[in-house]
Amino acid sequence: MADVSSRATPLASARREIVRVCRKLYERGLIAGQDGNVSVRVGPDRILVTPAGLSKADVKEGDLVEVALDGTRRRGQRSASSELAVHLVIYRARPDVGAVVHAHPPTATGFAVAGEPLPANALPELVYGVGPVALVPYETPGTEALARRFTPYLEGHDAWLMANHGAVTAGPTLLVAHQRMESVEHAARIILAARGVGQVQALPESSVRALDAARREHRIGGRAQSRRPLKPDG
């Protein structure tokens, strides 16, 4: 099991990173309006999360809210994100997770609205860099019931589509969680384009197994080992 303290980011660094990633999510069209939320583990039992009711394009370091894993606000003037429960259920179950990103990437969310999972065997980069993307059944956003929907899908997944809602990604660091969100949306665009041209061709099963094994072998709790992995670069 991963050491939770090894996934904690110093508070000052976490504040800067969250603001930077919020800007990127907005600028790249992965969120709009007051959509989305971002959090980072800053201690064994606490996280830093974006506030409710504020555009992520405008969020500042002082707007962020420090919350205990039991949901108690420890520091901050604003209310924590309405999707706090989803973040907390991931952190509690996954000590390897150091950051969580929730966004509404248009194409990936289109798959979620259609009730269509992303194929787990179509793109080497998705198999290796993200792994299988779970499709979580719909529940009202901002509720504990939605967080409970995640429970069967927490182990073995670092990315989730929420039916009729959006996407969530997790990683050992905010950089990785954000990259996974971009990868999920990029994969969704490619798969949609492929369906417009013809039929999505699955990778050979042997290739999927090899890529999945490489992802597992060269990552410890989601963190890449120092030796160079077998990584697709095409």
Task: Please place each PLM-identified region on the residue numbering.
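Glycine-rich flexible loops
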Residues: 1-234
